[in-house]
Amino acid sequence: MAQSEDPEDFIAPAAHRVRPGTLLLANTDLLEPTFRRTVIYIVEHNSGGTLGVILNRPSETAVYNVLPQWAEVTAKPKTMFIGGPVKRDSALCLATLRVGMQADGVDGLRHVQGRVVMVDLDADPEELAPVIEGVRIFAGYSGWTTGQLDGEIERDDWIVLSALPSDVLIEPRIDLWGRVLRRQPLPMSLLATHPIDVSRN
């Protein structure tokens, strides 16, 4: 039987401002190793600041070695991801809901945007398994104080775009940075052809 499909899995609405559920793509001139060619999913954005996690920085640490109870529901490759440079000794978890499921009334889930939810790692993964497609667990996060991110966007460090639910659980063998750019209209999609090492071009 074919799996149900959700239109939002294929079409991301245009993003003009930062809000939960948007992506920050590192611009081609942002060469700082921590954030170079990163794709950051925004989890919180309010008057107190902004919090997000890097979606394309897998580590070599297996989830089973850190949070074994969550290994079964973790999306491949079932490793911890580096969410950012802040509080690397703490963990944050995102998941995508199965099509047709809702987070309302489900203990351990907090809605972020669309089918993306934040997961309480103290919850029982077996109880959440029927509701979610999978989880991604991040060590640390990326954070900005009030106004800090606005300044970085103004100097073109970041491109603000909308996310698809599939971006959260995408396998690291896929170039997420390039994939997100290629689904944008011209001329922005041409940025996906920017070489990783411009000195070799």
Swiss-Prot record:
InterPro entries: AlgH-like. It comes from the Bacteria. Signal peptide: none annotated. Pfam families: DUF179. One of its GO terms (cellular component) is cytosol. HAMAP family: UPF0301 (MF_00758). Belongs to the UPF0301 (AlgH) family. This is UPF0301 protein MSMEG_6921/MSMEI_6732. It comes from Mycolicibacterium smegmatis (strain ATCC 700084 / mc(2)155).
